[in-house]
Amino acid sequence: MNKKDLKMRPVGNEYLEQYNALLRYVFQVTDQELSSVGWQEKEIIRAKFPTMQKADVIGWFDGDTLVSQVAVYPMRVKVFGKTYSMGGLTGVGTYPEYSNLGLMHKLLEQALKNMREKKQYICYLYPYSIPYYRRKGWELISDKISYEIKDYQLPKNHQVAGSVRRVKADGEELKETYARFAEHTHGAILRDELAWNEYWLWDRDDIMAAIYYNENEEPDGYIIYWIENEVFYIKDMIFNHEEARTGLWNFVSAHFSMIDRVEGSTYTDEPLAFLLEDASIKESISPYYMARIVDFPAFVADYPFKADGTEREWRFSMTDPIMECNQGSFLLKISKDGRGTAVKISEPCADSISIQTMTTMLMGYKRPDYLAKIGRIHAGGETIDMLEDAIEQQPPYISDYF
């Protein structure tokens, strides 16, 4: 296969069937898997059409045949209280006969350049290969904790001021509840119609939801779930405070006579076992989302560092396998009130870091002290202490899937 015969260009809506066919081939999505969640092939295409219209999709073509592709969804996320435009990378795939031609590297490079032009200075993705995306500049920023609780281990009922009511899973009440939660949750995606469409896309028809309302009738949390074969499956549970969490678990425990166990996932950094009276439950942790900073100086300009009594500086060199704007020596200045500026400088620097490590550090997933200990940051002790004091301590919450 000769790369000279291939052309890279935007993928229009007329190629939607080819787009989906490529994804189904690469990720081995069968008709049986589609039907298990109530989908038919044509329904998937219709469901994806509105999303494709909003996305930035680029691909390589062999004549009129789409052979490699990436898509970027326009999204917004919260980073320590600051709202950022984010590029959600998805739809990544190449037919095997076109592999080893460097097609995907070029697509990722172009996608990142497009994000930069659109001021999307942070990019999220769900990785099919963590090593591959690490080589391209992404790094882990969140975890998923899966758990299994036997019926006799469910928490006992505790009195709360509010109440739980079942609602339509696709209703506005659920969206309002999530919006209240995401507004103050670090890392959370601020879901618009596109993000909600992706959130529900692969769910079953019989999925259910319930909302916890506080004593002022304000929605302070929800649970999304289904029940099958005497198992209570929790897709997601969010809550703004401990009272809402307790109220939602009261609701789960009320199903005691109907179920043998509860299986679910949580996307916080807090294992569930410690909160239960019978803590001997099954829990497993796995990496979930990755991210990469697209344009470091632009990202830092909006980043909310912690305020301090003094101005702080750090000179360092940074590597990035794709984006030139993130390569070279930098001077990072942090003002007393926590405003950051980063400019390129010409002199060489003793301290060094990669864009991968910078991303996971500034997103709060791993701390500077830990990253220095494992050799991911090369800097003196005073610099590491300064970074520890300057960066908020809270891993991102991401429960989306796209």
Show which residues each predicted segment covers.
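Conserved active-site alpha-helix within GNAT-family acetyltransferase domains
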Residues: 117-121, 127-145, 247, 269-285
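A short, polar/charged loop-to-alpha-helix boundary motif
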Residues: 76-83, 149, 229-236
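Conserved GNAT acetyl-CoA-binding A-motif
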Residues: 108, 113-127, 257-267
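Active-site rim helix/loop that mediates acceptor-substrate recognition in acyltransferases
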Residues: 23, 31-77, 186-209, 299-305
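Conserved beta-strand in the GNAT
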Residues: 57-59, 65-75, 88, 93, ...
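Conserved acetyl-CoA-binding loop-helix of GNAT-fold acetyltransferases
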Residues: 89-113, 242-253
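Contiguous, non-catalytic segments that form substrate-binding/exosite surfaces or channel walls
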Residues: 147-165
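Intrinsically disordered, low-complexity, positively biased terminal segments
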Residues: 1-17, 28-30, 161-402
